[in-house]
């Protein structure tokens, strides 16, 4: 299989974890952000996961610089465009980019301006490249519940205009789900589709709760459903798609190596999986490389690839019309 040339669907990709190093250097200089060095390798060290990373919390520290740099509309528009451009060059046909609007208000932008600027970057790339994109609005679990209401209130105006879903992200604690039940009900009623980061750091029950209490249609990671039989069966029976990011899980010590990752076992047991990068820069990987690693480790064949692709199309939050077009890309 020529994995680079095959069409791909990316459903789990964070904007602020996927900046080009060159762009970070340019923006740091432009914004007057003081760094010890502006040399490529030194700046890359600030953005890419260190070898001694021990946890998800360590991993999340790589977002400090990108958030500082993305406080102006033109910067957000640029990095959204560049992420789309990078993805298009490896035949990603559709991508759902996620980010937290409330992290980008430090220099006076409104949430509306923040969301508009990212959508603008996506649309500009769509005009130039064979790729389509939509936006998922992430809310951070260490912020207040009120902040989720704020995101829903502003974001609902963009449903069908570039925004498709809402997400809960950040550090994961056992039993985090219950307090979000009411606000996620409002999100669904407001037109948001729902994907939730859960089961990334050892708590399979969080996945079950995210589906049953929050109405999650997809789960970000879902790695640890193997340690909760009810969660495992629920994901399988309901056809909930797991957005799986093996390199990221290795980086955060969810698993130690590709051989230990359950993605192939889940796939073979007819659990729907999507393969994504999570954070292209932080994890220092693109989607083709991620597929190559999974291919080498588990010897997946074209039928496996095709099934993952078509499951990913079905799980996407794009229009039915676009889904039909995307399906045609893999019919050989």
UniProtKB/Swiss-Prot annotation:
Enzyme class: hydrolase
NCBIfam families the record matches: aden_deam
UniProt keyword annotation of Phosphoprotein present: no
Positions bound to Zn(2+): 12, 14, 197, 278
The protein, known as: Adenosine deaminase
Cofactor needs: Zn(2+)
Keywords: Hydrolase, Metal-binding, Nucleotide metabolism, Zinc
Lineage: superkingdom: Bacteria
Function, as annotated: Catalyzes the hydrolytic deamination of adenosine and 2-deoxyadenosine.
Active site: 200
Database matches in PANTHER family: ADENOSINE DEAMINASE
MF (Gene Ontology): 2'-deoxyadenosine deaminase activity; adenosine deaminase activity; zinc ion binding
GO cellular component, one term: cytosol
Cofactor binding summary note: Binds 1 zinc ion per subunit.
Pfam families noted in UniProt: A_deaminase
Recorded family membership: Belongs to the metallo-dependent hydrolases superfamily. Adenosine and AMP deaminases family. Adenosine deaminase subfamily.
């Amino acid at each position: 299989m020529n994995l680079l040339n095959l069409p791909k669907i990316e459903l789990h990709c964070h904007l602020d974890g996927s900046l080009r190093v060159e762009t970070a250097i340019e923006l740091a200089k432009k914004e007057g952000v003081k760094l010890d060095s502006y040399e490529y390798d030194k700046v890359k060290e600030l953005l890419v996961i260190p070898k001694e990373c021990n946890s998800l919390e360590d991993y999340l520290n790589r977002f400090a610089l990108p958030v500082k740099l993305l406080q102006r509309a033109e910067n957000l528009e640029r990095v959204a465009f560049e992420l789309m451009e990078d993805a298009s060059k490896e035949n990603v046909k559709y991508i759902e980019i996620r980010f937290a609007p409330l992290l980008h208000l430090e220099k006076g932008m409104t949430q509306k301006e923040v969301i508009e600027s990212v959508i603008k970057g996506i649309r500009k790339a769509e005009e130039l490249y064979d790729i389509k994109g939509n936006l998922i609005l992430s809310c951070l679990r260490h912020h207040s519940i009120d902040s989720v209401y704020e995101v829903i209130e502003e974001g609902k105006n963009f449903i069908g205009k570039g925004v498709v879903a809402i997400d809960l992200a950040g550090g994961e604690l056992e039993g985090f789900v219950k307090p979000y039940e009411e606000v996620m009900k409002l999100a669904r009623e407001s037109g948001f589709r729902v994907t939730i980061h859960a089961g990334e750091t050892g708590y399979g029950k969080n996945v079950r709760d995210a589906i049953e209490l929050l109405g999650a249609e997809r789960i970000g990671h879902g790695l640890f459903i193997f340690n909760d039989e009810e969660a495992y069966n629920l994901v399988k029976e309901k056809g909930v798609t797991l957005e799986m990011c093996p390199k990221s899980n290795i980086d955060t010590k969810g698993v130690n190596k590709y051989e230990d990752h359950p993605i192939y076992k889940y796939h073979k047991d007819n659990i729907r999986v999507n393969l994504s990068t999570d954070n292209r820069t932080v994890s220092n990987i693109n989607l083709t490389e991620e597929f190559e690693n999974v291919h080498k480790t588990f010897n997946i064949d074209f039928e496996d690839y095709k099934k993952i692709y078509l499951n990913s199309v079905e799980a996407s939050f794009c229009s039915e019309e676009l889904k039909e077009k995307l399906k045609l890309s893999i019919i050989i």
